[in-house]
Amino acid sequence: LDHNNLTRMPGPLPRSLRELHLDHNQISRVPNNALEGLENLTALYLQHNEIQEVGSSMRGLRSLILLDLSYNHLRRVPDGLPSALEQLYLEHNNVYTVPDSYFRGSPKLLYVRLSHNSLTNSGLASNTFNSSSLLELDLSYNQLQKI
C-alpha cells in the first residue's frame, strides 16, 4: 500500500499480516484502534507521511521488531513501545523531548535513530538512553549542547 494517496489508516486488516508498508502516503494520524489485533506484525513502515500523532496504537503489537516513522511531523515519541521492538526510526520529525525511562519497556531495542529533530538538552533526561542492548543511537542534527 506504499506510494499511494491514502489519507488515513486502512482497515480492517488481516490478522495474519507480518509486514505493513504504508510509506509515502498522506496519512496524518494513527488512531488507537488502527492496528488492533495485528499480533503477528513484525514490521511497520509509515515513513514519508504527514503523521502528527500516533497515540497508544502500538501497544498491542507484541511481535513488532521494526517501526519506521521517519519523515513525518511527530512532536512526541509514540506511547507504549512494544517490548519486542529492536529498530525504531524517528529521524526527520519535530520530536522535541523523550520522556525519562522511555526505553525501559523495550529491552531488545538495538537501533534508535532520532536525527534531524528538535531535541534539546532540556527535553532529554541524562539516563534516557542507558540501555545495555543499544548498538546504534543517532542524535545528529538536533539542538543538543551536551550528551
Curated annotation (Swiss-Prot):
Pfam families: LRR_8
GO cellular component, one term: extracellular space
SUPFAM superfamilies: L domain-like
Start and stop residues of the LRR repeats: 1-15, 16-37, 40-61, 63-84, 85-105, 108-128, 133-147
SMART domains: LRR_BAC, LRR_TYP
Coiled coil residues, start to end: none
PTM comment text: Binds keratan sulfate chains.
Alphabetically ordered keywords of this record: Extracellular matrix, Glycoprotein, Leucine-rich repeat, Proteoglycan, Pyrrolidone carboxylic acid, Repeat, Secreted, Sulfation
Glycosylation sites: 5, 40, 130
Keyword Secreted attached: yes
Subcellular location: Secreted, Extracellular space, Extracellular matrix
InterPro entries, A to Z: Leu-rich_rpt, Leu-rich_rpt_typical-subtyp, LRR_dom_sf, SLRP
Predominant location: secreted
Family: Belongs to the small leucine-rich proteoglycan (SLRP) family. SLRP class II subfamily.
Subunit architecture: Binds to type I and type II collagen.
Protein task: Affects the rate of fibrils formation. May have a primary role in collagen fibrillogenesis.
Descriptive protein name: Fibromodulin
